[in-house]
């Protein structure tokens, strides 16, 4: 069950912030990726690992992306995956007494170093989806531009430039 992260100072997200809010608690690191440890599984249900997510996105396209990442991990071995919320400039909608911020979108970037290194980024608006995964695909450079985050700064510069500049869904079977 979802539970508050007591290591975070109050005010912090609590269960009741989500009740009747119209939003699901959307995992950033999915529970299905944490079956290797009871502690990791429990921590995946901390409210610091979730964001208010449109139900159709959480149960649909975002869930499909989580499953695709697990499939790629089985296929390629080690992957580096970073995901999180996107807040554009302007007034942010909130839910609950603790004013949990509702992201306008979410990002996920995936890096595979096995064989020829490759990476891909995705951006999902926090709303209705039901589109093919390829429609959400972006270069990692584009996701970096939107989020302001440098995702793989420790890669050798030549590798980083190459894998981040293009999105090739076909390289990922999309």
Regions found by a protein language model. Give the residues of each.
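Domain-level detector of nuclease and nuclease-like folds
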Residues: 6-174
């Amino acid at each position: 069950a979802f539970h508050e992260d007591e290591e975070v100072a109050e005010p912090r997200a609590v269960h009741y912030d989500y009740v009747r809010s119209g939003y699901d608690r959307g995992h950033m690191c999915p529970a299905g990726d944490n079956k290797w440890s009871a502690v990791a599984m429990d921590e995946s249900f901390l409210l610091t690992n979730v964001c208010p997510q449109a139900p159709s996105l959480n149960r649909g396209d975002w869930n499909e992306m989580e499953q695709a990442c697990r499939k790629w991990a089985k296929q390629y071995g080690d992957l580096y995956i970073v995901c999180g919320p996107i807040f554009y400039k302007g007034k942010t909608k909130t839910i609950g007494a603790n004013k949990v911020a509702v992201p306008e979108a979410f990002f996920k970037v995936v890096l595979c170093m096995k064989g020829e290194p490759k990476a891909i980024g995705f951006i999902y608006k926090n709303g209705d989806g039901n589109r093919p995964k390829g429609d959400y695909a972006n270069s990692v450079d584009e996701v970096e531009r939107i989020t302001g985050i440098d995702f793989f700064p420790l890669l050798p510069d030549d590798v980083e430039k190459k894998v981040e500049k293009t999105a090739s869904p076909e390289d990922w079977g999309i």
